[in-house]
Amino acid sequence: SDTARKAVKPSMFKSRYANVFKGDTGWRKIKAQKGQTFDWNTKSTYVQKPSFFDDLGDKEIKDIQPINSARILALLGDSITTDHISPAGSIKADSPAGSYLTKNKEKSQNFNSYGSRRGNHEVMMRGTFANIRIRNQMAPGTEGGVTRHQPSKKQMSIYDAAIEYAKSETPLVVFAGKEYGTGSSRDWAAKGTRLLGVRAVIAESFERIHRSNLVGMGVAPLQFAEGDSWAKLKLDGSEKITIEGLDELKPRQKIQMVIERAKGRNTKVNLLSRIVRAVIAESFERIHRSNLVGMGVAPLQFAEGDSWAKLKLDGSEKITIEGLDELKPRQKIQMVIERAKGRNTKVNLLSRI
């Protein structure tokens, strides 16, 4: 340590890092626009301004709307991974993403991968559900992102069908089996789903992180009751789906889905809300608290005098909160803090829904 103190001086680091943000000569030669905000290049096929908020503008944010007469975009099986939903591999020339790049004068040898073009939502939404290994049972005998548009019954890519539905402002839902969203926590698996116009995913079970990502993008993760599935309900994709009560959706709340079949027969099915998240604070600003509830995030408040600092939390703890499925306004609820060395601490919280 004495040798290090003699040999290593603060001035060495200061001189090395003094121009760290200037870069080398090659970096400084790159031409770039100057300004307070990023100047989007509309001709770039790698980076585009995402369209997540294009339909908002200056409008007041409304309550979450019910899903009325939605069309089914896909009927999927078990263990659909995030790579099935949003592949990161190479882009095929005959895919919707490949067609987009070709129209933008990119040669096929320069298509690169979905992962490398994740900064362009136009590519990524075209790649959603486009994995060649995915099988949509609405189009039996096919592989890849293929579906059957309703009511025309024309077979087309999932992306093209989503665009057709968007023209008529038709909401969409996706049905799946067990373990939907397993694999890596790929954010575009949720982003792409939302951009295609999907309002809800109804599955037999969900992977935790992808389920949370869906909620973050405003897509409702809804779970079949034990023993139910889209296969047992004999869905074929021609049905219309209505789901009421999304504006008041709470963690693990039971909610009803109405299936309108082609011949006019209706089937009512109970689903379970899989929104299970919480924010714990000493106090909440009213509007933000309301927004949290609207997104299915439970706002929970410490008792007077308590705080995470006083509880000496460092982030290594595990948190258990029971009773979120029956949460009422200003209800007292208990949080259990499991610390690294096995000691548990019980803390009372107050529901601020």
Predicted ranges, named:
Residues 1-353:
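Fe-S-dependent hydro-lyases/dehydratases of central metabolism
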